[in-house]
Structures are given as C-alpha cells and as structure tokens.
Amino acid sequence: MAASQQEIIAGLAEIIEEVTGIEPSEVTPEKSFVDDLDIDSLSMVEIAVQTEDKYGVKIPDEDLAGLRTVGDVVAYIQKLEEENPEAAAALREKFAE
C-alpha cells in the first residue's frame, strides 16, 4: 500500500522545515515552491535529495523542473510508489523503525 497524500505532505513538510525553516502548517498541496513558499533553486535541490532518500525514489532533474507545487510532488511520489509497491513497502518499514 502506497503512502497516503497526507503522509507524504507531512513528510515533505518536515523536509521543507529542516531545509528552509518554513512552518509545516504552511506546506499544503496547492502551495507553489517558488511563488508561495519562496524556496530558491538551491534549497529545492536539497529538498529533492532528502525526498529521494526518504521515499526511495529518483527524481531526475528534468522532472524536478516540472514539480512546481507541493501537490505535484505528492502525485509524483504516489505514481512512483504505485509503479514499485515492494520498494515503497520496504521504505515505509525502514522509516517506521
């Protein structure tokens, strides 16, 4: 079973807070990383790296450029988890410990 939208948003909110100091309550699906959260490209790369580590996904640079909102990243992670449910389950177990 893939992570729920709320689980992914909560995980992203933690990463975003760690990288930028933005309060997790500000991280909602409709928020744009650049326009609403004022996240620069260097911080976005760090968020992407931590997201890859947390969810065991690979976000190619060309895909990263198209992920403009929190909701875009959530949908992207869910799509990757659906394509490889065994890896998603193993990662959830790893992070539950």
Curated annotation (Swiss-Prot):
The keyword Acyltransferase does not apply. Residues 3-81 form the Carrier domain. Keywords: Cytoplasm, Fatty acid biosynthesis, Fatty acid metabolism, Lipid biosynthesis, Lipid metabolism, Phosphopantetheine, Phosphoprotein. Pfam families: PP-binding (PF00550). The modification O-(pantetheine 4'-phosphoryl)serine is found at residue 41. InterPro entries: ACP (IPR003231), ACP-like_sf (IPR036736), Meromycolate-ACP (IPR053393), PP-bd_ACP (IPR009081). 4'-phosphopantetheine is transferred from CoA to a specific serine of apo-AcpM. It is found in: Cytoplasm. GO terms for biological process: lipid A biosynthetic process. GO terms for molecular function: acyl binding; acyl carrier activity. GO terms for cellular component: cytosol; membrane. Acyl carrier protein involved in meromycolate extension. This is Meromycolate extension acyl carrier protein. The gene is acpM.
